[in-house]
């Protein structure tokens, strides 16, 4: 299964052991931006957390539990963030798509391009019928990414996310093959 893609100066690839310190650096740089929406990103995030995550990616991929990609600058190879498909529903052929981009590269289009590439991979290569993107109601940056790739806003799901132990409403977006001409 193809696992590397590029478009508009952005590349996606699977995690490698060499990404451990790069992931750590990107997360530490971005805690204040990402932490409200992704509880795994917290002030105590450590190099060991990065190592555990990167090491777990191969097994998650093989078992098709979560297909995770590193977002890189296609020219320099710089680590920009991550994107992936998870929460697969095999009976109904859909999955969740999530993403984050490091603070120093936010608002540069990396998340949008990575989301588009990953959605196409899910719909075309994996044969999914639907990709879902959930964004906390207060997470406008994530909502903008979903809207830029053409995801359809389906509404607010009450108490759909648990962030830092508290329930939060989420905006539900979806993509199907027709939305992306796949």
Language-model features: where?
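Conserved GNAT-fold acetyl-CoA-binding loop/helix
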Residues: 35-56
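Intrinsically disordered, low-complexity regulatory segments enriched
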Residues: 42-45, 58, 66, 105
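A short hydrophobic/aromatic micro-motif that marks alpha-helical segments and, especially, helix-coil
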Residues: 45-46, 61, 180
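A generic secondary-structure signal
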Residues: 56-57, 121
């Amino acid at each position: 299964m193809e696992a590397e893609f590029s478009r508009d100066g952005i590349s996606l690839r699977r995690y490698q052991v060499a990404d451990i310190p790069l992931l750590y650096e990107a997360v530490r740089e971005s805690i204040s931006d990402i932490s409200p929406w992704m509880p795994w990103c917290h002030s105590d995030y450590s190099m060991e957390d990065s190592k555990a995550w990167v090491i777990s990616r191969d097994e998650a991929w093989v078992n098709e539990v979560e297909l995770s990609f590193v977002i890189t600058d296609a020219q320099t190879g710089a680590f920009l963030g991550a994107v992936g498909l998870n929460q697969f529903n095999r009976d109904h052929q859909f999955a969740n798509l999530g993403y984050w981009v490091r603070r120093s590269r936010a608002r540069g289009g990396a998340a949008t391009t990575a989301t588009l590439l990953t959605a196409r991979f899910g719909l075309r290569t994996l044969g999914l019928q639907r990709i879902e993107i959930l964004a906390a109601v207060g997470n406008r940056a994530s909502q903008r990414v979903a809207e830029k790739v053409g995801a359809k806003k389906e509404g607010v799901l009450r108490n759909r996310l648990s962030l830092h132990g508290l329930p939060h409403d989420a905006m539900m977006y979806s993509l199907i093959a027709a939305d992306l001409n796949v």
